[in-house]
Amino acid sequence: FVMREEEPEPRTMMPETIPWKLLQGIALVQLYREEKWVEPPELDRLPYSLLYHQTISTLASTGELTPAELAQRVLTLSYFHRISADDYRVLLRHLIKIDHIQVTEGGGLIVGLAGERIINNFKFYAVFQENEEFTVRSESAELGTIVNPPPPGERIAIAGHCWIVEEVDWKRHTVFATQVKGRVPAYFGDCPGDINTHVLERMRKALNEHAAYPYLMGNARARLAQARHTAEISGAGTKPLINLGGDTWVLFPWLGSYAFLALERMLKIKCAAELGLRGLDPSRPYFMKADEETFFEVLAAEAEKDFDPIELVYPGEVPYFDRYDEFVPEELVCKGFAEGVLDIEGMKQRALSWRDHA
């Protein structure tokens, strides 16, 4: 591994002085050396995008099928073990509505005209998400292009400035944005390159332990020693919540991407009002009126509740995540994200484990 980083500025806040990429690289190497561990596949998602692909390709290869015959061929595939017949019925009705599937006079199903256009594209059988370019516009000005745009409310850097995303038009591949001040935080919400919680926990251990790693070069050893000193003084390696002065706080949850994303949404949607929380953003300090004890009490109380995962989807949000999500009903896209992508159970376990800090 080669990690490049800019020298932290003298007035940089504590979280930005820790070499996160270096810690991640160490964690990956150590997990393999110590446990022969590699990140496991995610087999319990709700892959509605892949379900669309398999449905259309099955009809294209076999010809007319009854709904029952189609369900028997597709839903019995092991990867779809969490998808119910009711969900499949919702998908089929939607595909008929948008003409990707057509109903014959005998009640059978065949590929529709719109579906034919998708199938005849040579890229159809590549089921993984491509890097498709989106045009970024602000009012009448075209700013440039990006790939994999973040959802509304997140920030992007383009044309030498920072912009907040107002709307994403997935059909026209256009992002509408408004210029704001500030820098762009590291965004990793809706990208496929997720990080497992086990990696983050090993990163924390690397920050706290005094072990030397023989594969590190001189500069890396020096940066690691500096980071360990910073963590020891600040408590970053042992305390999840640290006050940076006044009402400015930083939270170190040490969670993987999708448990982290669930925690961020829980705080914004369910806890922000009671905690006086504002400015919560990945990799940036946030502002909170409540004290440390209240923070953990409120978070644990919300984590204990038996809420519907769909409550962690923002109002009006349709979190397109996979290649063919745009052809899936919005209700299934939201359900697939809330119940199949967000690691709510991992988030709850971590939130409840912080009770002792309250």
Predicted feature residues:
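Amphipathic alpha-helical transducer elements in NTP-driven molecular machines
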Residues: 15, 19-26, 49-52, 67, ...
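C-terminal accessory/connector segments of nucleic-acid motor ATPases
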Residues: 36-162, 168, 243-258, 270-281
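Terminal, basic amphipathic appendages of nucleotide-handling enzymes
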Residues: 2, 131, 169-241, 295-358
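Conserved segment of the helicase C-terminal RecA-like domain
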Residues: 1-43
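A generic structural motif
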Residues: 109, 173-178, 277-298
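Conserved, well-folded catalytic cores of nucleic-acid-processing
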Residues: 2-5, 28-35, 58-62, 77, ...
